C-alpha cells in the first residue's frame, strides 16, 4: 500500500485550516513542470533549497561570531535550521502549511554575505550606485536565477507562494510582478510565521552564544526584565543544578514562552477577526490588521530584549572589530575583481554583459564563505 499524489493532497487538505495555503493553491511556478508522484509542491521546494549550493555554503558563513573564532557557535546554517524547526512547530499548531513555512525558512538567508551583517553593510555601500544590495533580494536572485542545477530553467523554479514568502521588504524585483502581488494581498500567514521564527531564533541563540563566548554575563542579563523573570522562575524550579544548565534551561524556557505566546495570540486574532479563508486575511491586511504577532505584553518585552542585545552584545568592541575586519576583506576583494575581472570564475563572468560587472562581482563575493573570502584576501596580501 502507498499513498498516491491525490491521496497526499486530500490528506493535506484534511489537516489544514481554511485560511492555510494548500498545495493546490501554490501560485504555480514560472516554468511549467510535471508534478511529482510522491512529493507535494512545497515539499519539492524544501528539498530543492536543501540541495542547493547556496544552502551548503551557509555552514561556513557567520551568524554573529566570525567562523574562525570557533566551531561551537551558530553559523548561518544552524541558525536557518533552527528557524525552520520553529516555523514547522508554529505552523502545525495553527493548522497552517508547515511545508510552506519550512521552505521559506530554509531559503530566507541564502542571500546572506560572508561575515554576517557587516558583509551586507559594506556590499550595500559598494553597490549603492549600481542597483544596491540587500540580502532578501539576493535570496530571491539565488533561487530564481543564480543557482544552476536544472536543464530546463534557471534557479530552483520554486512556487510563487514560496517566493512571496521571501519578500520580507518592499523592494522592486524584476522580471516578475510577484512583489506587487504581495503588496496587494500581503504575505501568507506561513510567510509571516517564518519571519517571526527568525526573530525568536536569533534572539534566543545570540544570548546563548554571547554568554558562551563571555560577552554576556549573568549580571548583564539580569538587567533585562524579560530574561530576569524567566531566569528566576527556572532558578526556583531547579534549585540544585549548576549555572550552565540553568542558563540553557532559561534560554529554552524563553524560546518556549515566545513560541507559545505567538501561537496563542495568532489563534486569538483569527477568532476575534472571524478569519475563515485566505480572502479574509487579504482583507484584514489591506485594513492594516496584522494577524501574526505577539501579545502586547510579550511584544513589549521582546522589543526591550532585542534592544538590550544590541547595546550589550552586538556593539561589543570585539564584535565591532570582527565586523570591521569582515568589511575590510570584502571591500578589498570587490576592488580587486573590479580591476581584474578576468579573475572572476567563468560561471559568473559570462553574465557580465547582461547584468554589469558590479552586479556580477556582488553576486560572486556575496556567495563566498567566510573562509574562502579570507583565503583569497590573504593570497592578495
Curated annotation (Swiss-Prot):
Cited Pfam families: HD, HD_assoc
SUPFAM superfamilies: HD-domain/PDEase-like
Assigned keywords, A-Z: Hydrolase
Molecular function terms, GO-annotated: triphosphoric monoester hydrolase activity
Keyword Manganese found: no
Family: Belongs to the dGTPase family. Type 2 subfamily.
Protein name according to UniProt: Deoxyguanosinetriphosphate triphosphohydrolase-like protein
Amino acid at each position: 500500500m502507498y499513498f498516491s499524489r491525490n491521496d497526499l493532497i486530500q490528506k493535506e487538505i484534511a489537516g489544514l485550516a481554511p485560511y492555510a495555503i494548500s498545495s493546490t493553491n501554490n501560485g504555480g511556478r514560472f516554468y511549467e513542470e510535471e508534478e511529482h508522484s510522491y512529493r507535494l509542491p512545497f515539499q519539492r521546494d524544501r528539498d530543492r533549497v536543501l540541495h542547493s549550493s547556496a544552502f551548503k555554503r551557509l555552514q561556513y558563513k557567520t551568524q554573529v561570531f566570525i567562523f574562525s573564532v570557533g566551531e561551537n557557535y551558530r553559523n548561518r546554517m544552524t541558525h536557518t535550521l533552527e528557524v525552520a524547526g520553529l516555523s514547522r512547530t508554529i505552523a502545525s499548531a495553527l493548522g497552517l502549511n508547515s511545508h510552506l513555512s519550512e521552505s521559506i525558512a530554509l531559503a530566507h538567508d541564502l542571500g546572506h554575505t560572508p561575515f554576517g551583517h557587516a558583509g551586507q553593510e559594506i556590499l550595500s555601500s559598494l553597490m549603492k550606485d549600481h542597483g544596491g544590495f540587500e540580502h532578501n533580494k539576493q535570496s530571491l536572485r539565488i533561487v530564481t536565477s543564480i543557482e544552476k542545477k536544472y536543464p530546463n530553467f534557471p534557479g530552483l523554479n520554486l512556487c510563487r507562494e514560496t517566493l512571496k514568502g521571501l519578500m520580507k521588504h518592499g523592494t522592486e524585483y524584476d522580471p516578475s510582478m510577484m512583489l506587487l502581488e504581495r503588496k496587494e494581498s500581503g504575505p501568507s500567514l506561513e510567510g509571516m510565521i517564518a519571519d517571526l521564527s527568525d526573530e525568536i531564533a536569533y534572539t534566543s541563540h545570540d544570548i546563548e552564544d554571547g554568554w558562551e563566548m563571555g560577552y554576556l554575563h549573568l549580571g548583564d542579563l539580569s538587567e533585562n526584565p524579560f530574561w530576569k523573570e524567566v531566569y528566576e522562575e527556572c532558578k526556583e524550579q531547579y534549585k540544585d543544578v549548576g549555572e550552565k544548565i540553568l542558563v540553557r534551561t532559561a534560554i529554552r524556557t524563553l524560546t518556549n514562552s515566545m513560541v507559545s505566546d505567538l501561537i496563542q495570540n495568532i489563534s486569538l486574532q483569527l477568532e476575534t477577526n472571524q478569519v475563515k479563508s485566505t480572502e479574509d486575511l487579504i482583507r484584514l491586511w489591506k485594513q492594516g490588521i496584522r494577524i501574526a504577532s505577539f501579545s502586547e505584553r510579550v511584544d513589549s518585552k521582546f522589543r526591550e530584549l532585542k534592544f538590550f542585545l544590541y547595546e550589550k552584545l552586538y556593539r561589543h568592541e570585539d564584535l565591532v572589530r570582527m565586523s570591521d575586519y569582515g568589511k575590510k576583506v570584502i571591500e578589498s576583494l570587490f576592488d580587486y575583481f573590479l580591476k581584474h575581472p578576468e579573475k572572476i570564475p567563468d560561471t559568473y563572468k559570462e553574465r557580465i554583459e547582461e547584468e554589469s560587472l558590479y552586479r556580477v562581482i556582488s553576486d560572486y563575493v556575496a556567495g563566498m564563505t567566510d573562509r574562502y573570502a579570507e583565503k583569497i584576501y590573504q593570497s592578495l596580501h
